[in-house]
A protein has these predicted regions:
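Extracytosolic ligand-binding ectodomains
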Residues: 2-5, 9-14, 22-440
Length: 440
């Protein structure tokens, strides 16, 4: 009896355990997300004057580089199997060659992987020797003096044209359209201003135009009355100034106050809308050149992104510093390394289409097939009027039309569905033609 009860209780307990054991199994948990890849910080330097008379141009250049950095970080680029985090190290060289070399060494010590800059030729040329000596590539988006790439230094590039392209462009345009017989030339005694003025003078003399003895200022001159009074007595048909807008604007304003009626022409450093701010109504009708396509012709995506991020339009060379930054990053991607020794060969042979068009470099580091643009000031705004490339001049409007992608061909209309064949039973019987009809 007791054994029977024990057996019953044992079976009941086992049954209970069985019910529990056969209950619903726990749901499988989703696999844990893989850990994010390790990151790698890659520093890219940018240098331009962020204080002083041309700080607006320096900030414009920096904005272009910063936009490229932000876009690259948003793209989740992986290099060496690691998540790349690009950091822009922005420095102010004040447009001063001595400060420029100090800043260059600072970037070398910070172990930047590459440099975009400097803005001025006068700072870019001495700084380039420091970067090249440290095997750090530099790409200037605005330094136009030929000496930058004629030094034969390794790893030095530019995304704009050279002054020995820009000088002839503005001089030949002036000769062809204004036909001056006597031209005065003034420069600001910088590597950029003097170098560009030299190219203009050579071209004018080769065209048979008489050129007055050179007049000089500095990159800080604000009172030009002594120089202009001397020029007024010589009655030139045109005046070319090699310098920046911060000094070119006051020169032009003072010239008109002295009733000098000559056509005033400028290079890219003074080819900005700020000339209107500095010279007032005297700016209308000026001629100037830029060593590349104008900002208005830059890639639309770049223009929209720039305006959205900075709430202003590009001023001058920000499309070119944007491209310079992207070129460094693209070369690193191709080499799968931020090590300059590994990515420099990729940079030298790169072919890239960016905000300023198609870019590739020659053996010196110059941009191949660089365009030059001629502007005039109209109603307070710079207006591009001509593009010069390979010695050929075309109107800006024609250049824009030629650059627009051809419209996609219209899709062929869909074929009408085939008529359903009539069923044999429903097909009408054709009448035999009458004899008279057959004779007709």
């Amino acid at each position: 009896m007791n054994k029977t009860r024990v057996s019953i209780y044992t079976l009941a307990a086992l049954a209970t355990l069985g019910v529990v054991g056969c209950g619903e199994e726990p749901k499988p948990q989703p696999p844990a997300a893989p850990p994010p890849p390790p990151s790698i910080e890659i520093k890219i330097g940018h240098v331009a004057p962020l204080t002083g008379g041309i700080a607006h141009l320096g900030k414009d250049n920096e904005n272009g580089a910063r936009l490229a950095i932000d876009e690259a970080n948003a793209a989740n680029i992986q290099i060496e199997g690691k998540q790349a985090k690009f950091v822009l190290v922005a420095e102010d060289d004040q447009g001063d060659p001595k400060v420029g070399t100090t800043v260059a060494q600072k970037l070398v010590d910070a172990k930047v992987a590459g440099v975009v800059g400097h803005l001025n030729s006068g700072t870019s040329i001495p700084a380039s020797t420091i970067y090249s000596g440290a095997n750090i590539p530099m790409i200037s988006g605005s330094a136009t003096n030929p000496l930058l790439t004629e030094q034969g230094l390794k790893g030095v590039f530019r995304t704009v044209g050279r002054d020995d392209q820009q000088g002839p462009a503005i001089a030949n345009y002036l000769v062809a359209n204004n036909k001056p017989k006597l031209v005065a030339i003034v420069d600001d005694a910088t590597a950029y201003g003097e170098g560009l003025a030299n190219e203009v003078e050579k071209t004018l003399k080769a065209a048979g135009v008489k050129v007055l003895p050179r007049e000089k200022g500095t990159d800080k001159t604000s009172d030009w009355k002594a120089v202009l009074t001397k020029l007024k007595g010589r009655r030139p048909d045109a005046v070319f100034y090699g310098g920046m807008d911060a000094t070119g604007g006051p020169m032009l304003k003072q010239a008109r106050e002295l009733a000098i009626k000559a056509v005033f022409t400028f290079g890219d450093g003074a080819c900005t809308d700020k000339m209107k701010e500095l010279a007032g109504d005297a700016a209308d009708g000026l001629l100037c050149s830029q060593a590349g396509i104008p900002p208005q012709a830059a890639d639309k995506k770049f223009l929209e992104a720039y305006k959205k991020k900075f709430n202003v339009d590009p001023i001058l060379y920000s499309p070119f510093t944007y491209d310079g930054t992207r070129l460094l990053i693209e070369a690193m991607k191709k080499a799968n390394s931020p090590d300059p020794a590994k990515y420099l060969p990729e940079l030298q042979k790169i072919e890239y289409t960016g905000a300023s068009g198609k870019i590739s470099f020659d053996d010196k580091g110059d941009r191949k097939d660089a365009e030059m643009t001629i502007f005039t000031m109209k109603e307070g705004k710079l207006a591009p009027i001509a593009i010069i490339k390979g010695g050929l001049t075309i109107s800006f409007d024609d250049f824009v039309k030629a650059s627009e992608p051809a419209p996609a061909p219209a899709a062929a209309p869909a074929a009408a569905p085939a008529a359903e064949p009539a069923k044999a039973a429903e097909a009408p019987k054709a009448e035999a033609p009458k004899a008279d009809a057959a004779k007709k």
